[in-house]
Amino acid sequence: GLGDVYKRQVLELRRGKGMVVCGSGVRATGFGEPSASGVWVESPAGQLVPDPDTFSTGSFFTNPVICESMFTDVLEQISAAGIDTDVMPKFPGQGGVKLSAAWLIDQAGFSKGFPGGEYPASLSTRHTLALTNRGSATTAELLEVARRVRDGVWERFGVELVPEPILVGCSIPPLD
């Protein structure tokens, strides 16, 4: 039906961008097979092991642009947390100040590889802005990591991070 045509058109239009797709009736075709190149890395012991960052969503959150008055509030929260506001990356943004999502994530206490352990989805071990499937993660598990990071940045600084990939048939629950 028309819904299937629309889904195919959206997927074709967005195929050059990141997407998280779940739900029934959606087939992502024409994207090619995943490549095995770069899937292995050398461990500190000199052994080849699977690279946990191979299957990445790339940059998961956009850099937020906030208004000047909100920026003043954010600076106060950052300063109250004992963080030097002079080192905070900030740039002129359309209609306000653009902040670095990666910096906010780091400063909110989310380190590379969060949550660690055996959880199947995590922040990349190379960059806190990328989410990775460590091999067996479900969409729900990936979005749970994204939710925890988004909520943590919100609680610490009052800045809402917005996903960069288009979420099709799934979502991150709204902030409380």
Task: Identify the role of each PLM range.
Residues 1-6:
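Short, small-residue-biased leader/transition segments that mark boundaries at the very start
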Residues 8-10:
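General membrane topology signal spanning transmembrane segments
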Residues 13-175:
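Glycine-rich, charge-dense phosphate/pyrophosphate-binding loop(s)
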